[in-house]
Amino acid sequence: EMSRGLGDVYKRQNEDGEGMRYVLGETLQEYQEEIMEKDRPSVFLATSQTARDCLEQAGMQYEGEINLKDVGFCKMETQQECLAGSLCIPKLLDILGERYKILFFINRHHIVIVDDDEFSYRLIRRIKRKKTRQGESKEKFIYNFMLEFISRDLELLGHYEKRIMDLEEGVMDGKIQGFQNAIMPIRRELLTLRSYYDEIMDMGKQLEENENGFFAKKQVKYFGVISDRADRLMSKASQLLEYAQQVRDAYKAQVDAQQNNNMQFLTVISTIFFPLTLITSWYGMNFHNMPELKHGYPGAVSYTHLTLPTILLV
């Protein structure tokens, strides 16, 4: 209910065409026009409908289209007036499903975040609840914001590791039924996460390069921390993919061993019954000059009686 109430505040302010605005400082404070200077460095939180108004308030000119539906990657581009970027963040409970899609814009003084899902709003609420130094600078806010949406990913990767270990134990115990249906989604999700972490790492490096000079030189170190964190997550995802492949190879070895056992059993059966098969083949031909043709059945029975003890001994 509390989450729903917070979302209502977010929607109401955006429906009024204002968006939300947080003034940068050690603690993020909602902007109050009556008591705060208009040009104070801020974070504007907007929806697609209020994005243009917020960009105008922040003194940014962006000529591109603002369409969250087109967001498909985490990337950033440098423009003359601002940095423009997008975030495409997998939902932890549905990695392969719909993602949180965000656009953001940065200039020398302000940050504008465009989000129709309230995800950014919830992240800011979490930052305000958990951090004592929430955003005394643009760099510190971006650092807190980006680390917050990957803060649970190491735990998530730990759950994947546990699932793969359980599958490995099953394979070692010969429980291989349903293995392929279990391992394939894990591999696909880990591949998705690895690509996502790679994109976040590249974005951190781009921010650290500070091509437009929008960031203080002493503050760009925060972006290096983001890159390092994403790099570690990407390495962990790669290790888990390799681990999953090793377990898959073990599964294939188990399947091959079972097939070999089946073939050996069938070979033994074929060897045992080969003499009987040979006898029935001979007497099924009915050649004209074949011995015992006139007394075929007694002959076949006699041969069978002679052969059976040998078969039983084998």
Model region roles, listed by residue range:
Residues 97-178:
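Switch/coupling subdomain of P-loop NTPase systems
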Residues 166-168, 175-283:
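Membrane-associated alpha-helical segments
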Residues 4, 8-133, 199, 203-215:
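Helix-boundary and N-terminal cytosolic regulatory elements
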Residues 274-308, 312:
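Alpha-helical transmembrane anchor segments
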Residues 1-13, 305, 310-314:
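Single conserved hydrophobic/aromatic residue that forms the stacking wall/gate
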Residues 7, 142, 146, 259, ...:
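Alpha-helical structural signal
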Residues 45-46, 147, 187:
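Conserved residues at beta->alpha junctions
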Residues 27, 89-91, 171, 175, ...:
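Short, well-ordered turn and helix-capping elements at secondary-structure junctions
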